[in-house]
């Protein structure tokens, strides 16, 4: 089954730590909250520096869509931009984020340990889909997608939720592929 999740319909929700807002792209199981999800994908606009919310037993993957950000962990500092590979880290480890030179838009994937594993990759072109329960494709720019003999048009930040994915996928512009197993 394939569902298009339009960016235009997303509602801004306050962050757990009260320091900003995020827009949920998709969550599993549907309707679950921050305490009950197996996985959750959201997009945030970050304007100010501050600590990331701590999520016990959650693994996170952060991908910058626009802008640059420094992340400070207890043992390292990492700078990311819109060309960086997605960065995975434990959600229960303290992290402090600082936008560099202006606002940042990021994609945040959270997976509950013991229930789900998430893998995020930047993609373009044709590829074999990974063996996963769910695959989510998030358009970075306007993107034409072909999957399961369907041709679909995605606008910026629209997403496809594919349950029990088929063999292959073709995207004609940069996108993010999230495999959830």
For each feature predicted by the language model, list its residue ranges.
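Jelly-roll (double-stranded beta-helix
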Residues: 1-181
């Amino acid at each position: 089954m394939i569902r298009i999740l339009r960016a235009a319909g997303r509602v801004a929700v306050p962050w757990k730590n009260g320091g900003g807002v995020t827009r949920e792209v998709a969550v599993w199981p549907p309707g679950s909250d921050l305490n009950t999800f197996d996985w959750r994908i959201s997009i945030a606009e970050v304007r100010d520096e501050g600590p990331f919310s701590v999520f016990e037993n959650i693994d996170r993957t952060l991908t910058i869509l626009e802008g640059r950000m420094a992340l400070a962990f207890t043992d390292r500092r990492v700078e990311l931009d819109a060309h960086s590979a997605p960065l995975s880290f434990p959600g229960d480890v303290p992290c402090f984020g600082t936008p560099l030179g202006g606002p940042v838009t990021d994609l945040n994937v959270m997976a509950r340990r013991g229930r789900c594993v998430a893998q995020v990759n930047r993609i373009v072109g044709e590829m074999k889909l990974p063996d996963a329960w769910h695959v989510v494709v998030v358009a970075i720019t306007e993107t034409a997608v072909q999957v399961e003999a369907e041709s679909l048009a995605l606008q910026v930040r629209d997403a496809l939720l594919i349950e029990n994915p088929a063999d292959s996928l073709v995207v004609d512009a940069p996108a993010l592929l999230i495999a959830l197993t």
